[in-house]
């Protein structure tokens, strides 16, 4: 299914090794070569992989110092994507409130939500997700 404006909530727990990270891609383009999707990066700030908003560069580093994420525990992530505005809460604390000025049109089109895992430093790592819920926001 493709989503345009929505709120996604989920719990995650992630490996604490090195630069290993995971992520949630928003409105991911389905055709190759169009461009990158918004990604809510899920990682360890101490390793340079904070929970924050990434496109082809960091748009907002969010929990850069790991002040909100709880290592080795379940963490609650809530993501709201309405038009060019992306908001993220980690454990009920707002960590990203970003409005993309003049984004490429493809970033505002409906697309799938994708979960990602990304090994680093030769380490496969792991991530677990649970309690996922998506609420679609209807256009007014």
Describe the role of every protein-language-model region.
Residues 1-140:
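Carbohydrate-interacting regions of secretory-pathway proteins
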